[in-house]
Amino acid sequence: LDSIPNITAEDIREHWRRTHTAGNLRFVVAGNFVGRIGQLREILNSFELGAGDRLPIAVDEMHSAPAFAIRRKDVPGIGLAISLVVPRKLSDAENEAMSLLNHILNGTLHSRIQGEARRRGLLYYMWSQLSTFEHNSSWDFGAQVSVSNLPAVVDLVTNEMQRVKDGLVDETELAEAKSYAMGRYQMGTQTVGQIAGWLADRYFFDGVIDDFSAVPARINAISPEQIIETARDIIRHNCWTLGLYGSTDKTMADQLYDRFAKLF
């Protein structure tokens, strides 16, 4: 924020020249192009952009951080966030494995964490997801929880992650997660918007055009062992933090941080 007053018009022009080039441009167009391919190419080739280069993605040095709390007295519930980072780009198989694990943990009303937390009246909704970047990947959890239920929710998350770490993923729950993933796959390209979104999700990131027809084989190839080892590797790196948002304080965040630290 302190640097904002120092930005000049020339800084903006230089940024534009460096970033708005054909080499740094990525886009996806989806639809019925029968008889219109030539017109589309003409439009795309009319862009007045220099050749340029694809700009590299910066490498950040990742490390654990202390607990944090963003205090907002006007927010009644508490936003809970937990993030674990591994300093590498996970493979397609590892991404698929973690997607299935996240479904087992938080994907349904019968899932290990969200389902159990709802059954016990601890929260209404909790999510988890795996995000892969060029130089690191993160496994993130989030929920909206009342102050009184925070310790129980963090203990539940910790215990279920420990169970995975201990190798407790069975074929039955994996089969259910695969069935859900196959249904999501079958419904994933019913509109041109979905097709464009599917392709863009990967292509914008690393230039790979994902083979939609190969997805079922990728899903079916995942074993409990693959899930367990991928989760263990993320936990093994011990690079994480926990934070709160709402009408709470740093003391509560520190206490929850210590509870979750038992996983490591």
What label would you give each PLM region?
Residues 1-54, 89, 97, 119-264:
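Charge-rich, well-structured scaffold segments of protease-associated domains
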